[in-house]
Curated annotation (Swiss-Prot):
Family according to the record: Belongs to the CinA family.
Classification of source organism: Bacteria, Bacillati, Bacillota, Bacilli, Bacillales
HAMAP family tied to this protein: CinA_B
Name this protein carries in UniProt: Putative competence-damage inducible protein
NCBIfam families: cinA_nterm, molyb_syn, PncC_domain, PRK00549.1
Disulfide bonding pattern of the chain: none
InterPro entries from the UniProt entry: CinA, CinA-like_C, CinA_C, CinA_KH, Competence-induced_CinA, MoaB/Mog-like_dom_sf, MoaB/Mog_dom
Length: 420
């Protein structure tokens, strides 16, 4: 099913608000196996909306419109669509009752234009609005499905997930549509695509869709099949081929984050973790303790932003700071050793470096050193040169830290299995 999303509202064209609805709809439709080919934004103008509908109806099988269902004169989506499809607008009694009740409960006068929000296309499928007044609706005309949704995200989003997606699924046919997202870190999008070029070029069912964001790359595999079991087998086979080539960078599925994967692995292996932070300013500890179950493995996060605190809290030797500076692999190792001595954790990690925007100790922004102590192994320092804003450098540092620990756990598990 080829889909198109039309956002209606002059405030979108003027940049007064962001079109977050478009992003959300594309995400939800992709999960449902619906291909979105076009996005359009139209102001509150009947003529231009009519022209947009004429173009969309020629090239798309599903047209979703958001916004313009309110009570004012510039809310004209329903009227334009009704005229375009030669359909009558009628009052939806359920919606009207809901609107009347809203005003009565608040002891407010209801103006006549509020009744406009209860108007729907005749014989349309109605999507009740549980968080606002204007209902959504869907109608099929000459093989094209038209879906009209309210503009406010708090009204539109639950309507889509709870009512629209099930409606669309019932109209796709009896095909099972299943998606699986593979998550990778430590490899760029271009390199990943190069490694998988023949698989991506030859994709049909499942389809393979790469996406890069903040140092990570995901692959969304989507399969369509009449049998759910066979669909899963097709996904398994495609995943196997992918992981044979780039499995070293794979860490999880769907919405799993590196932090969540780390907490899961630490908990399963019974390893404890503590952190010493300078560059990241406590972000690592804050993020990991946001994850349910982190208390089973995470002991402490110590933030030492100044050299004095590094010496007094973490016992970083003065000669390390004098000879090498705080932004150095030697300091990173000393910080990791210091927090290990304090907490007795199985795994300790430290972060030091320059987030920017200015250089420090002669080091350029993006210079990062991660210290790592893993059980009784020799401590090590990992050197990174990252790019981006101050916030991006910190975020990417956290992800690299998680990856380093996960890699050490993997090697430790492999060594343990070899001894069995």
């Amino acid at each position: 099913m080829k889909a198109e999303v039309i956002a209606v509202g002059s405030e979108l064209l003027l940049g007064q608000i962001a079109n977050t609805n478009g992003q959300f709809l594309s995400q939800q439709l992709a999960k449902a196996g619906v291909d979105v080919f076009y996005h359009s934004v139209v102001g509150d103008n009947a003529t231009r909306l009519q022209e947009t509908l004429e173009i969309a109806s020629e090239r798309s099988e599903l047209i979703i419109l958001t916004g313009g269902l309110g009570p004012t004169k510039d809310d004209l989506t329903k009227e334009v669509v009704a005229s375009f499809l030669h359909k009558e607008l009628v009052i939806d009694e359920v919606a009207l009752e809901q609107i009347v009740s809203f005003f009565e409960k608040r002891n407010l006068p209801m103006t006549e234009n509020n009744r406009k929000q209860a108007l729907v296309l005749k014989e349309a499928t109605i999507f009740q609005n549980h968080y606002g007044m204007a209902p959504g609706m869907a109608t099929i005309h000459q093989g094209v499905t038209y879906v009209l949704l309210p503009g406010p995200p708090r009204e539109m989003r639950p309507m889509v997930t709870e009512q629209v997606i099930p409606f669309l699924s019932s109209h796709v046919g009896d095909l099972q549509i299943i998606s699986r997202v593979l998550r990778f870190f430590g490899i760029g999008e271009s390199k990943l695509e190069t490694e998988l070029e023949d698989l991506i070029d030859g994709q049909s069912n499942p389809t393979i869709a790469p996406l890069a964001s903040e140092g990570e790359v995901t692959l969304r595999l989507t399969v369509k099949h009449h049998d759910e079991t066979q669909a899963a087998l097709l996904l398994d086979e495609t995943e196997r081929k992918i992981r044979e080539r780039v499995g070293h960078y794979f860490y999880g599925y769907d919405e799993t984050s590196l932090m969540e994967k780390l907490v899961s692995c630490l908990t399963k292996t019974g390893l404890s973790l503590a952190s010493a932070e300078s560059l990241t300013g406590g972000l690592f500890g804050a993020r990991i303790t946001n994850i349910p179950g982190a208390s089973a493995c995470f002991l402490a996060a110590i933030t030492t932003y100044t050299n004095d605190m590094k010496q007094s809290w973490l016992n970083v030797p003065p000669h390390v700071l004098e000879q090498h500076g705080a932004v150095s692999p030697e300091c990173a190792i000393a910080m990791a050793q210091g927090v290990k001595k304090l907490t007795k954790a199985d795994v300790t990690i430290s972060f030091t470096g320059v987030a920017g925007p200015s250089p420090s100790e002669g080091k350029e922004p993006g210079t990062v050193f991660i210290g790592l102590c893993f059980r009784d192994d020799e401590p090590e320092a990992i050197t990174l040169q990252l790019s981006g804003s101050r916030e991006q450098i910190r975020e990417r540092t956290l992800k690299h830290g998680c990856q380093q620990i996960l890699n050490r756990i993997k090697r430790w598990n492999e060594r343990s299995n070899d001894k069995v």
